[in-house]
Design a protein with these regions (language model features):
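Second-shell loop/turn segments in exported
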Residues: 76-84, 115-122, 126-130, 138-145, ...
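Conserved catalytic neighborhood of penicillin-recognizing serine enzymes
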Residues: 67, 102-153, 161-162
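Extracytoplasmic
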Residues: 56-59, 66, 76-80, 84, ...
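Glycine-biased, low-complexity coil/linker segments
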Residues: 11-13, 36
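Active-site-proximal helix/loop microenvironment
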Residues: 72-88, 161-205
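Active-site SXXK
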Residues: 61, 69, 82-106, 131, ...
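A penicillin-recognizing enzyme superfamily signal
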Residues: 138-153, 178-288
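Beta-lactamase-like hydrolase cores
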Residues: 38-76, 151
Length: 290
């Protein structure tokens, strides 16, 4: 997927390409320093580049400034409408569980198909961090077994998510099924809030899991396509809501850099699993970065 470097205005107002000897900062690093018109030019350039190199309508995306929450670029039909988001809801189910159990998270043995996981052979012994990294359905079935929609309402409000259906319970609250729908825009902002609350109980383990996901979990395709920066990633696969139905749609949310995110990218790819959506997200970030 060839492309020309994405230009970003310098502080002096001229444009610089990735080959400029004076350009030692990445576009992502520059975004945190750029204000006003220059930030707007970055957003315009990002939108043009993403739509040029990823033109297919099978790909939906939202690119946000991680500090302000401003949408920098987007191509997503009705992004304010609630839809199933699959395992992207697992971190918030974990927070809801923590609020009910003093943030003590149990370990669990995932035995694969026999304990309801997507990985037939299972993940073995997992804790919250590794369960997030590998999106272990077995762990989250165990974690949410005693949760009801009412238990999740406070967490949904705290992070600005749509509430699950009143009679949703158990694994439905971990994004398995369609009983907890939320809007793509709302979910993107919920992840930004998760990062802002990184010092709160339970959140650190979740973010550590997202960092591990980007390196060696279900989001590892992000790092393979975009190796120049550490990232936070979470993947998911959910029921397709396109008019042209597929068995499912893949989702990936990525924040870079991991230690102080400057941008968030939420991607949906029609008819593929979440790991493949992570690869698309990594390719998009590589384009923006360079």
């Amino acid at each position: 997927m060839g492309s020309s470097p994405l230009p970003l205005p310098s502080r002096g107002g001229s444009t610089v390409g990735s080959q400029s000897a004076s350009s030692e900062q990445s576009n992502v690093e520059r975004l945190s320093a750029e204000k006003g018109g220059n930030s707007s030019l970055f957003a315009q350039s990002a939108a043009q580049a993403l739509n040029r190199d990823f033109p297919g309508r099978d790909i939906s995306f939202l690119l946000l400034d991680a500090h302000t929450g401003r949408v920098l670029a987007s191509r997503w039909d009705n992004p304010d409408n609630p839809i199933p988001m699959g395992s992207l809801l697992k971190p918030f189910a974990a927070v809801a569980y923590g609020e009910q159990h003093d943030y003590h998270y149990p370990n669990h043995t995932c035995r694969g198909t026999s304990t309801g996981c997507w990985l037939p052979r299972g993940h073995g012994e997992v804790d919250l961090t590794t369960a997030v990294a590998h999106s272990c359905n077995s762990y989250f079935r165990m974690l949410t077994a005693g949760l009801t929609a009412d238990d999740v309402f406070a967490t949904a409000t705290r992070f600005g998510l749509d509430r699950p259906e009143l009679d949703a319970s158990g694994a439905e609250l971990a994004g398995l099924g369609t009983r907890w729908r939320t809007s793509p825009v709302g979910l993107a902002h919920a992840y930004l809030e998760l990062v802002r609350e990184r010092q709160q109980p339970g959140v650190r383990q979740i973010l550590d899991g997202m960092a591990l996901s980007a390196r060696d979990g279900t989001g590892a395709q992000v790092h393979r396509a975009f190796p120049s920066a550490d990232a936070l990633a979470k993947t998911g696969t959910a029921t397709c809501t396109h008019s042209r139905r597929a068995p499912g749609d893949g989702f990936s949310v990525v924040l870079v850099p991991a230690d102080d995110p400057q941008i968030l990218l939420l991607v949906r790819v029609h008819g593929v699993p979440g790991a493949q959506a992570a690869r698309t997200a990594g390719q998009m970030l590589h384009l923006i970065e360079n």
